[in-house]
Design a protein with these regions (language model features):
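Phosphate/diphosphate-binding loops
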Residues: 358-396, 402-404, 409-423, 536
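Repeat-blade elements of multi-bladed beta-propeller folds
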Residues: 82-86, 119-140, 162-186, 210-231, ...
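Blade-level signature of beta-propeller repeat domains, shared across WD40, Kelch, NHL, RCC1
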Residues: 556-598
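Structural motif
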Residues: 233-237, 326, 379-381, 446-451, ...
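Aromatic (tryptophan-biased) beta-strands that constitute blades/sheets of beta-rich domains
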Residues: 37, 43-116, 150-159, 195-204, ...
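Bacterial N-terminal signal peptides
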Residues: 9-20
């Protein structure tokens, strides 16, 4: 392990050691304890100087669209739950609950919190099924009572800690729960007890391949892939597993298969070859990780897979060509893994602009069947699925200097940066307003390239960015403080035209989920720990409060005993993002005394 990677690892051990419920494998236990105390001091300093949350809304005077929203449909029986990562398999994130609405949201308050006891990169997208709320940390899966936040059960796993300790959530199907691990496995658990039922290896941790994504499940299958596309030699694959046994039903290579690659199950048919990868000698085809969840069209049995960056991330001269299927949404037959089509959004990527979240599949007010997706390049893309043509590409955060090539002899500044744009959470779609809501990060990066010799010297299985830095916190490029440092954007964009109606700027980036409801609200949070309820029609803030640590995971809403509640994952701590050091918690909010649908 090189010194830079070890430094990052020590910091992550520090973030995850010595707290209630902790349990990293701890050969560095003493060292980590020291670093943890330093981390707590860092958190206190950040808390002292962190500004209060603030938002400002701007209306587009050129917007032409529907003057009034469509009438709300009555809640369906399924509205009581949030059964999948993005609620529906098609990922719209819309809830038809309206008990909490524009008229009473001012009375919203935190009712209870569940403390995981961990300092971790808390990105879990909770699910709510059969009266229990399920969440994950890097090492744990837990079930809590959504009425009281009392723990039903918690199952802890032991394996070596990863550079950034992340897990994005679990899937549910027929009494079983499923999650990935940072040592390359998929695990299944009994929903009621948390007992482990099976495990299947789908990635090679020695190569840098990990499984942080939230799976989805449908018709006896569990769909999940591996991340690790920033590590030399690592490749992305997509899998379907048998939900009862864990057996691999099919495997699909998201970048070309070459000699020596591991085949773990039957392969889905693919047209992919090496023609779009003209790599220089000694540079292995690398990248294409699928590090976030996926989307499924159950009517047509199609799986939509977002695919990450090629590597080395910042030097595309090492790998001339479009580098398929990186920077794409790949559509597969969900039953067989056979290739159907793809949409490449970021060809020849040199900014680390992954397609970083599941696309949403919607029927617009104008009668279109649309795929909308918002990757890290800072745009919202809308594709008409009738002919697969691009309808619009709308900027939804600051875009600057996006075309300048990177160089060995100078710094190049660009926006959005490598952790900018829309990250691992999907947009949300509100059928009542016909708006797509995107939550984005406005944060720039400065890059200077390594020499070709330095890039070639990187060992297999080590980070392979191509960027010249000795700061472990800048592994994804040097983040800029010179231009206002950072912000967040929430855009409301017409699903038919791609024109934005209103946009809201937050003084903290928006990494967490965006959730619209039939109550006329949009819920979101920022990495300042501020949680907001926004009027979906106008963009005006109706309620806001700091509810804990940085918000970068799920925001879901559901009912318990006829009462609507909202659950938020708070306490995101990452060596790449300067947030307050607070333990990971689930906050459950509601309005006391409100019961029944309205």
């Amino acid at each position: 392990m090189n010194r830079r990677l070890r430094l990052i690892g020590i910091v992550v051990f520090a973030l995850d050691a010595g707290v209630v419920g902790g349990g990293v494998t701890s050969s560095l236990a003493d060292e980590a304890g020291i670093e943890a105390r330093v981390g707590e001091l860092r958190g206190a300093i950040l808390s002292l100087f962190a500004p209060a949350g603030a938002v400002a809304t701007e209306t587009n005077s050129n917007y032409k669209g529907a003057a009034t929203p469509a009438p709300a449909a009555p809640p369906s029986p399924a509205a009581a739950d949030w059964p999948s990562y993005n609620k529906t398999l098609t990922s719209e994130r819309f809830s038809d609950l309206s008990q909490i609405n524009t008229k009473n949201v001012a009375k919203l308050k935190v009712l209870c919190t569940y403390d995981t006891g961990r300092l971790t990169s808390f990105e879990t997208g909770p699910i709510m099924v059969e009266g229990a709320l399920i969440g994950t940390t890097e090492f744990d899966i837990f079930s809590i009572d959504p009425s009281t936040c009392a723990e039903n059960w918690r199952t802890h796993e032991e394996y070596p800690a990863y550079i950034i300790p992340t897990n994005r959530g679990a899937a549910y199907l027929d009494g079983r729960l499923f999650r990935g691990t940072q040592d390359g496995r998929v695990l299944a658990y009994d929903f009621k007890t948390g007992k482990r039922l099976w495990e299947t290896t789908i990635a090679d941790a020695k190569k840098g391949e990990v499984v942080p994504a939230a799976p989805i499940a449908w018709e006896g299958l569990v769909f999940i892939g591996n991340a690790g596309g920033d590590f030399k030699g690592a490749k992305g694959h997509m899998y379907a597993l048998d939900a009862k046994t864990g057996k691999i039903v099919w495997q699909f290579f998201l970048v070309p298969k070459t000699e020596g690659d591991t085949v773990r199950g039957p392969e889905g048919t693919s047209p992919l070859d090496t023609s779009t990868w003209k790599n220089v000698p000694g540079a292995p085809i690398t990248g294409g990780g699928t590090w976030t969840s996926t989307t499924l069209d159950p009517a047509n049995g199609l799986l939509y897979v977002p695919v990450g960056n090629p590597a080395p991330d910042f030097d595309n001269s090492v790998r001339p060509g479009d580098n398929l299927f990186t920077g794409s949404v790949v559509v597969l037959d969900a039953k067989t893994g056979a290739y159907k089509k793809h949409f490449q959004l970021v060809p020849r990527d040199w900014h680390d602009w992954d397609v970083s979240n599941p696309p949403i599949l919607i029927n617009t007010r104008g009668g279109k069947r649309l795929m909308a997706v918002s990757p890290k390049d800072g745009h919202l893309y809308g594709f008409d699925l009738a002919d697969n043509k691009l309808l619009y590409r709308t900027p939804v955060t600051r875009i600057e200097n996006a075309e300048e090539p990177f160089a060995v002899d100078k710094d190049v500044h660009f926006c959005p940066g490598s952790t900018g744009g829309e990250e691992w959470n999907s947009p949300g779609y509100d059928p009542l307003t016909n708006h797509i809501f995107t939550g984005d990060v406005d944060w720039c990066t400065t890059v200077k390239l390594q020499t070709r010799e330095e890039i070639a010297a990187a060992p297999l299985g080590e980070p392979w960015m191509g960027e010249k830095t000795f700061n472990p916190f800048n592994e994804f490029g040097k983040f800029s403080r010179a231009d206002g440092f950072w912000a967040g954007w929430l855009y409301a964009t017409d699903a038919d035209t791609g024109m934005w109606k209103w946009r809201l700027k937050s003084n903290y980036p928006i990494y967490g989920a965006v959730t619209p409801t039939a109550g006329g609200l949009v819920f979101f949070g920022d990495v300042g720990g501020n949680f907001y309820a926004i009027d979906a029609a106008t963009g005006q803030k109706l309620w806001g409060q700091k509810i804990g640590g940085a918000i970068a995971g799920g925001v879901i809403t559901f009912t318990v005993n006829g009462t609507q509640k909202v659950a938020v994952a708070t306490g995101y701590v990452s060596p790449a993002v300067p947030t307050e050091i607070r333990r990971a918690r689930i906050a459950i909010l509601g309005i006391e005394g409100e019961t029944g649908s309205k």
